């Protein structure tokens, strides 16, 4: 709320009275500072008349956030700092000097800083000037990537990009041959870091190194085009072949096992059926011990035994007559 009022106050002060003869000067239009260093932003002002109750204000416009922030305000001997810049700003105290020094500068502090001086007693004049501040930072480790299919006859390109780096890094690609780096300049854009390879057959496979650099230093990343081109395909092919071979072997073993089980089951069924048939035939043949004695027992006097035919003859009327005749003949002979 208070910073917003500070932004409105200069407008109200201008409407209440005219500012005349206030001239703000910024001798340096651009300031470069290393990360963690201190940035001194020079700003002086002059007036043809006494300023009276004037005030000084510094504003910061972040290009990254696209927002304007009030970071410093001075009026009637009191100074204030705000936001991320609180306790980081030291202001000049001599008359006519509105310079400030900002400590521990970070990449997020890169942007435009505006010095403003207002006096309600004077007419309108040149009351503000801006300075660009660049917080220099070494390129971060680049991200390297291959786009496209790394096979013969295919279009591919190598990417190299840093997330941070100020000034903006420039990129260079090199072919790595043991300890020797050979620059690669064909179809290469040093600003974007993209290396185009129109046909892999015209390019020697191997290791490639990207170097991103600026005045603060450099960072590198590498790509192994050989392993991605050959070893990767070989490993993938071998893996697929091994899987297919395992599937085929398992299928063959399963089929053979199923056939063997089916054959064994059929053989067992035939043996059981043969055994049952044999037992049935054996059960139909009468046993001598179980055969009923239907023949006439022989006389005690003669102790004669009936013949097998007589014993086996069934008891019919004809057989009964034959038995009677035999009995009579036997009785006559005994007399």
Swiss-Prot record:
Expressed in thymocytes. Disulfide bonds join 43-115, 160-210. SUPFAM superfamilies: Immunoglobulin. Its main location: membrane. Residues 255-335 are cytoplasmic. Keywords: Disulfide bond, Immunoglobulin domain, Membrane, Repeat, Signal, Transmembrane, Transmembrane helix. Residues 266-335 are annotated as: Disordered. Residues 1-21 form the signal peptide. It is found in: Membrane. Residues 22-136 form the Ig-like V-type domain. The keyword Transmembrane applies. One of its GO terms (cellular component) is basolateral plasma membrane. Residues 22-233 are extracellular. Residues 268-306 have a biased composition (Polar residues). It comes from the Eukaryota. Residues 319-335 have a biased composition (Basic and acidic residues). The chain crosses the membrane at residues 234-254. GO terms for biological process: epithelial cell morphogenesis; maintenance of gastrointestinal epithelium. SMART domains: IG, IGc2, IGv. InterPro entries: Ig-like_dom (IPR007110), Ig-like_dom_sf (IPR036179), Ig-like_fold (IPR013783), Ig_sub (IPR003599), Ig_sub2 (IPR003598), Ig_V-set (IPR013106), VSIG1 (IPR029861). The keyword Signal applies. Residues 139-226 form the Ig-like C2-type domain. PANTHER family: V-SET AND IMMUNOGLOBULIN DOMAIN-CONTAINING PROTEIN 1. This is V-set and immunoglobulin domain-containing protein 1. It comes from Gallus gallus (Chicken).
């Amino acid at each position: 709320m208070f910073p917003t009022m500070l932004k409105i106050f200069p407008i109200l002060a201008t409407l209440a009275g005219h500012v005349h003869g206030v001239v703000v000067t910024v001798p340096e239009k651009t300031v470069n500072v290393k990360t963690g260093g201190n940035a001194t932003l020079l700003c002086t002002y002059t007036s043809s008349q006494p300023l009276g109750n004037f005030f000084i204000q510094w504003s910061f416009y972040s290009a990254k956030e696209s927002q304007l922030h009030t970071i410093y305000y001075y009026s009637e001997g009191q100074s204030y700092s705000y936001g991320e810049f609180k306790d980081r700003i030291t202001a000049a105290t001599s008359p006519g000097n509105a310079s400030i020094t900002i400590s521990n500068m970070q990449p997020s502090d890169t942007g435009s800083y505006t010095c403003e001086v207002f006096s309600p007693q004077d007419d309108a004049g040149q009351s503000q000037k801006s300075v660009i501040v660049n917080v220099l930072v070494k390129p971060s480790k680049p991200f390297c990537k291959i786009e496209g299919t790394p096979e013969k006859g295919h279009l591919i390109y190598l990417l190299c990009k840093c997330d941070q780096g100020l000034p903006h890094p420039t990129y260079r690609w090199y072919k790595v041959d043991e300890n020797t780096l050979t620059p690669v300049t064909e179809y290469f854009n040093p600003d974007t870091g993209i290396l185009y390879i129109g046909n892999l057959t015209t390019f020697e496979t191997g290791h490639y190194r990207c170097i991103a650099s600026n005045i603060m230093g450099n960072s590198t990343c590498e790509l192994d085009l050989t392993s991605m081109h050959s070893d990767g395909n070989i490993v993938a092919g071998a893996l697929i072949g091994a899987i297919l071979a395992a599937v085929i072997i398992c299928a063959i073993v399963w089929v053979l096992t199923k056939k063997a089980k089916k054959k064994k089951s059929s053989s067992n069924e035939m043996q059981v059926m043969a055994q049952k048939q044999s037992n049935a035939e054996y059960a139909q043949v009468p046993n001598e011990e179980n055969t009923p004695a239907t023949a006439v027992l022989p006389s005690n006097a003669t102790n004669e035994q009936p013949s097998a035919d007589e014993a086996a003859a069934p008891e019919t009327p004809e057989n009964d007559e034959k038995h009677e005749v035999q009995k009579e003949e036997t009785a006559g002979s005994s007399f």
